[in-house]
């Protein structure tokens, strides 16, 4: 309307200082523009707009103070705001003041790959993998501070695009004068373990993983078995960052999570994209549900999942997962009590509220529930015929 002359505006100045496109972790991506709008009135106070539940607080911040509070885990910021604030801090150092910094960014916006900083000392690289749709990537996390010790978690690269993404990040790490002290694999599923031979041509580091995961790959004497209660500290410019190991084997035997002050690297326990399967062959539904409850009880600030965007509201998401799995567990039991005895009819009854569920996946998940019901003595199995105990 303003371009057509229908509307006019005087005394208003606005400039785009950068833009960001959300990474390909979800079916829908967003292109965001960030503006600088000088008000000319230092007394203007930001007000909290009603109905905006995604925001926690509105206030003015100096960019350097914003980053400092975020790095101290005092506040949470979405990844685009972190890199924007860092760009502003650098531009202010170069230009002398905020207005000049914004003018410089508007004239020459930052280009190229942006770091995905999910939390202090937690970066993410998206590796394309053949994982469960609608997810298309596995999250490879880089732990530790720039200029300090780093750990690579789940480098799942198996094709040229994945190798290029990983190689770019590794070079960036070395350019920061960082050292890579280990590669950690959260579990042994193929969408988390990449081509180790090709990866070793990009960088070399000992492998840390659970005994079950190490048994699934070729490893050396320099590798380390991680188990419940273990921990490690990554030294960096601001001190040491500690990470603790907890076991969460429901989705996969030997799966581990990494617990730190910034949040929990939660592997394949929950996701905002699609669902998490508990395979009937090797999974454990009881351990999976209790693992979700344990992670929730740790009250993490953020979850860094194996697939999809970071989870900024862990308590709500984990509670939804727990309630959903327990409700499905009850539906499977009720299906058996109603006289359904074979896996096909049990799955059809238990998943009657989910007509879009793939029948083979529904049967596999129903079987996982049945195995747990057998373990607890609620169901009996006689040559794949299930009856109430």
Locations of regions flagged by a protein language model:
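Conserved beta-strand hairpin/beta-sheet module of binuclear metal-dependent hydrolase folds
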Residues: 122-172, 257-269
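Metallo-beta-lactamase
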Residues: 149-152, 157-160, 222, 231, ...
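Short, well-ordered beta-strand micro-motif
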Residues: 36-38, 60-62, 117, 126, ...
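Active-site segment of metal-dependent pyrophosphate-handling enzymes
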Residues: 1-46
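Residue-level signal for inorganic ion chemistry
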Residues: 143, 307, 332, 373
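C-terminal regulatory/interaction regions
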Residues: 334-389
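Extended, hydrophobic interaction surfaces within ordered domains
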Residues: 27-41, 47-110
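Active-site HxH/HxHxD metal-binding segment of metal-dependent hydrolases
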Residues: 136, 157-242
């Amino acid at each position: 309307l303003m371009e057509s002359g229908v509307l006019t505006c005087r005394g208003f100045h606005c400039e785009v200082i950068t833009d960001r496109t959300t990474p390909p972790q979800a079916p829908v991506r967003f292109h965001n523009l960030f503006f600088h709008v000088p008000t000319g009135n230092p007394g203007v106070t930001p007000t909290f707009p009603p109905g905006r539940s995604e925001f926690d607080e509105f206030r003015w911040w100096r960019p350097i103070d914003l980053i400092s509070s975020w790095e101290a885990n005092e506040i949470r910021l979405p990844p685009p705001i972190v890199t924007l604030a860092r760009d502003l801090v650098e531009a202010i150092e170069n230009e002398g003041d905020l207005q000049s910094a914004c003018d410089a960014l508007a004239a020459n916006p930052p280009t190229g790959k942006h770091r995905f900083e999910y939390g202090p000392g937690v970066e993410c690289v998206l590796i394309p993998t053949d994982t469960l749709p609608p997810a298309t990537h596995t999250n490879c996390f880089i732990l530790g501070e720039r200029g300090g010790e780093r750990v690579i978690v789940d480098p799942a690269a198996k094709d040229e695009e994945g190798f290029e993404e990983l190689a770019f990040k590794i070079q960036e790490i070395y350019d920061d004068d960082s050292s890579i002290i280990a590669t950690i694999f959260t579990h042994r599923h193929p969408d988390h373990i990449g081509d180790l031979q090709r990866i070793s041509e990009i960088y070399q580091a000992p492998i840390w993983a659970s005994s079950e995961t190490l048994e699934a790959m070729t490893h050396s004497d320099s590798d380390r078995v991680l188990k419940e209660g273990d921990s490690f500290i990554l030294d960096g410019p601001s001190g040491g960052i500690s990470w603790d190991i907890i076991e969460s084997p429901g989705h996969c035997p030997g799966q581990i999570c990494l617990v730190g002050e910034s949040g929990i690297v939660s592997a394949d326990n929950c996701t905002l994209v699609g669902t998490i399967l508990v395979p009937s062959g090797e999974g454990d539904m009881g351990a999976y549900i209790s693992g979700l409850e344990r992670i929730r009880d740790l009250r993490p600030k953020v979850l860094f999942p194996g697939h999809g965007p970071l989870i900024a509201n862990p308590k709500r998401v984990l509670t939804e997962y727990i309630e959903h799995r327990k409700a499905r567990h009850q539906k499977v039991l009720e299906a058996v009590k109603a006289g359904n005895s074979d896996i096909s009819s049990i799955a059809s009854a238990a998943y009657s509220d989910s007509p879009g569920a793939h029948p083979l996946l529904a049967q596999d998940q129903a079987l996982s529930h049945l195995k747990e019901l057998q373990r607890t003595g609620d169901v009996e199995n006689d040559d794949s015929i299930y009856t109430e105990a």
